[in-house]
Amino acid sequence: MSRKTLYELQAENVRKTYLFIVTFSLILFAIGYFFVWYFNWGLTGIVLLAIFIVLYNWIAYEQSDKIALASVGAIPANPEEYYVLHNIVEEVALAAGIPKPNVYIMEESQPNAFATGKDPKHASVCVTTGLLQMMNREELQGVIAHEISHIRNRDILLMTVVAVVAGLIILLRDVMLRSMWWGMGESRRRDKNDNGAIILLIIGLIFSIIAPLIVLIIRSAISRQREYLADATGAFIVRDPYGLASALEKIGSYTRPMRVTSDATAHLFISNPFGRAEKLFATHPPIEERIKRLKSLTM
């Protein structure tokens, strides 16, 4: 298999993002159309559904980075208070040939980090306070280089859009569950032969079961090879694979789960924020394997 150039990888990520948005739109329309038909909302319901899908796709494309940052409680890193962090981000961005991304801080003891945005000109890097406390300069530089590699490779667009879409799926799951319990209560007060309520209950139950699986499949669609590529690319940007390898060793030794995160955003982070090992549907390769590959690199 021939190696792909950076430009080919970037173009592939953009194509996958558009394909993902189109596929998700069709699935969402199919789900919405059922409710339009069931409640007999007619043409008005179809028009409103179409408007919602277009609006949501625009938000997912244009505002997904802001949503991702807000969902984890990230705040802008004060340049004076976090001078060293800003300095490292600027150095690595310059070496990678991209504009300096916005820098955010997340009040969290778990050492972790992620990048978000739609392109190198509209990107952000977020690190936890735990990461800053545990890492020395070389290790922090390695982590930042990994995240900036995601920005340069344009992984961030697909990763962030997937996070927003997965969030909607989880929200729909929760709405279905509430509707199901509400429907059960209502059905006891109505005629036992109310077939409509029974149908809604069945659909709600099915969706509540498959929704988590849908999220896992979506997350796994983001290839684990992207993490290997970002590790290697980051190491070459700073000419040092050992900084990131050492950082991953420290990150891997911390098993306490992150306080503020969800299945929708887990794939954004450099390491699994739930503090547990995953094999099936995992979006991150094993940290041990990542460290092994980094230490085998020659600069």
From Swiss-Prot:
Gene Ontology biological-process entries: proteolysis
Q: Which residues cross the membrane?
A: 19-39, 41-61, 156-176, 198-218
Q: Which GO terms describe its molecular function?
A: metalloendopeptidase activity; zinc ion binding
Any binding details for the cofactor? Answer: Binds 1 zinc ion per subunit.
Instruction: Specify which residues bind Zn(2+) according to the UniProt entry for this protein.
Output: 146, 150, 227
Q: Name one Pfam family in it.
A: Peptidase_M48
Name the CDD domains for this protein: M48B_Htpx_like (cd07340)
Its Enzyme Commission number(s) read 3.4.24.-
Q: What's the top EC group for this one? A: hydrolase
Q: How does it sit in the membrane?
A: Multi-pass membrane protein
Recorded hits in NCBIfam families, A to Z, give:
PRK04897.1
Instruction: Provide the protein name.
Output: Protease HtpX homolog
Q: What's the source species' lineage?
A: Bacteria, Bacillati, Bacillota, Clostridia, Thermoanaerobacterales
List the gene name.
htpX
